[in-house]
Amino acid sequence: MVESLFPSIENTGESSRRKKPRISETAEAEIEARRVNEESLKRWKTNRVQQIYACKLVEALRRVRQRSSTTSNNETDKLVSGAAREIRDTADRVLAASARGTTRWSRAILASRVRAKLKKHRKAKKSTGNCKSRKGLTETNRIKLPAVERKLKILGRLVPGCRKVSVPNLLDEATDYIAALEMQVRAMEALAELLTAAAPRTTLTGT
């Protein structure tokens, strides 16, 4: 009789284990995303990734130079004016490819060519009046937003493909993107030093 009123400790432990809530799929996805982000941050700091990126960047820039050498004289002026932008876009695409599509920002950069083509077609169909009204609407929304939300919105614009993501995902993507850019700067500085050191030798040998 008394035992029925007071259940044993073993039974209570078993029931508590049964009632333990399971981790939701969203929480599991966030944990997995953070794990991937941590591994990605470590990868950007390794010399091996930097060397691979530098080699791929040199190959990509060489292909760009080969395309420019086949252009006609009439297209030379346009090519020179857009050379800096093409080099920057090439460097960013190689950087995104180095991320192997594990991040949102890398996938956004790789898809930028397709979006640019679609944007040209859509821009021709838009009217001037709609653009003005939309611009005024964004300006009023910018004034109404609090300071923190406004800064997060700016951060979302700076990180490719992160304008409409949650705050935790935005911070993870921004952290990984910054680490990738830092690696990009180190690789470019190393390439610049190599080219500077090789320039006098090339001049002396005449090659």
Swiss-Prot record:
Any GO CC annotation of this UniProt entry: nucleus
Entry-linked PROSITE patterns: BHLH (PS50888)
The upper taxonomy is: Eukaryota, Viridiplantae, Streptophyta, Embryophyta, Tracheophyta
Query: Which gene produces this protein?
Result: BHLH149
Q: Does the keyword Iron apply?
A: no
InterPro entries for the chain: bHLH_AtIBH1-like (IPR044549), bHLH_dom (IPR011598), HLH_DNA-bd_sf (IPR036638), IBH1-like (IPR044660)
Molecular functions (GO terms): DNA-binding transcription factor activity; protein dimerization activity; transcription cis-regulatory region binding
Biological role stated in the UniProt entry: Atypical bHLH transcription factor probably unable to bind DNA. Negatively regulates brassinosteroid signaling.
Where in this chain does the record put each bHLH domain? 132-181
Q: Which organism is it from?
A: Arabidopsis thaliana
Listed A to Z, the keywords are:
DNA-binding, Nucleus, Transcription, Transcription regulation
Q: Subcellular location, in the record's words?
A: Nucleus
Q: Does the keyword Transferase apply?
A: no
| Protein name as it appears in the record | Transcription factor bHLH149
- What binding partners and quaternary form does the record give? Homodimer. Interacts with PRE3.
Annotated region Disordered: the residues are: 1-25
Alphabetical list of SUPFAM superfamilies matching this protein: HLH, helix-loop-helix DNA-binding domain (SSF47459)
Q: What is its main location?
A: nucleus
